[in-house]
Amino acid sequence: MRAKIYHFLVNRKPGIRQRYHRFHDGTTGMKKVVSWFYLLWLNFCYYVLFCRFLGEQTEFPVYEEKKPPCAESESVLANRDRRSVSETVSFLMQYEVISFDIFDTLIFRPFSEPTDLFFFLGEKLEILDFKRLRMQAEAEARTQKYKEEKHYEIKLSDIWSRLQNEIGVIKEQGMQMEQALEMEFCYANPFMQQVFTQLREHGKRIVITSDMYLSKAFLSELLQKNGYEGYEELYVSCEYEKSKADGSLYEVVKRAYPDTDSMIHVGDNPVSDVKNAKKHGFEVFYYPNVNRNALLYRSYDMSAVVGGAYRGIVNNKLYNGTEQLPMEYEYGYIYGGLFVLGYCNFIHTYAREHGIDKLLFLSRDGDILRQAYAVLFPEEKTEYVYWSRAAATKLMAR
């Protein structure tokens, strides 16, 4: 019910949504209450006083203009000068111990921002503005940890100890739901999965090093689910109260291997995974974050949930380094699929509402639509019909 009210008052008009979040986000106490009255006032002005300008976003146009590369595909431009899987394996083979980062290196989330997962958790909990509350609780937990122990490394339980007082959800229940979503959404990076597997087949010594509030036990299960097994140790910042962010976790890894200085770390963060690793005696292999070009090429004039998933899925595909795809394929993957999915869903809904028991897809443009429709709704009757465009033009002209 709360989600429906939120959608009704906030999401129907882009301008109202923008103005409300600009005022509401980051507020606490009485100002948060005032923001709710502000939301009601915006709706009153728009629908009762006919202040239609409030429905339009300010500063940013409703539809963005992006200029993706036209001469070559994005994946070709991004991956042409990068090492292939086999070249990466050959390079890493010269080191005795190989350390891997987890998120955005071994494991992908289908989002352009990792915190987008909190949208889905908030929907399950039926809590408005949960993403902000979750991020705020994490920031406050880190601040409190530093005040008490002079470091920022926290566990998921520290975050939910704060959240349960804020939102009224039992800590253990919230933690379980959040971890279940991580397990559901996370998947293996196809590039690094091949690299990892080949290194294991060659008998290389592998460790995994991550700055994370999720427990070692949970991350072990997540890695196993996605095909990462056979590593020697998993170093997680919240377990050791040391981090890559300040370099102290690298010292923990080095102490575990006192007989070698032939160590390399693989990761996507220029500071934590590159600068700090070098500073603490590791060689480094920088794996560029797949979402680094999200602002340049991907659209942001979409809903937060759909837009985050769209950008993440597309960027994970194009920038992981596995393939150099032709422009035609990328055009379909980035743009065409969205339109086809939306149109097929529209046809399905229309047919169901009007009792239509068989759908005819007309040649030639209908061929791809019918193939997609058959995948989405295999139980429905469809037929591909040869049809003259000239006949269609004459029919519509009458």
Summary of predicted features, one role per range:
Residues 269-284:
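Acidic, divalent-metal-coordinating active-site segment for phosphoryl/phosphodiester hydrolysis
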Residues 1-100, 328-331, 335-355, 365-369:
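Non-catalytic pre-domain segments flanking phosphatase-related domains
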Residues 245-271:
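Conserved Lys-Pro-Asp/Glu-containing loop-to-beta segment of HAD-superfamily phosphomonoesterases
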Residues 99, 207, 211, 356-363:
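Short glycine-rich phosphate-binding loop at a beta-alpha junction
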Residues 381-398:
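Long, charge-dense
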Residues 149-208:
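Short, acidic loop-to-helix structural element flanking the phosphoryl-transfer center
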Residues 89-135:
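Active-site neighborhood of HAD-like aspartate-dependent phosphohydrolases
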Residues 200-207, 212-238, 376-378:
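Substrate-recognition/cap helix-loop segment adjacent to the acidic, metal-dependent catalytic center
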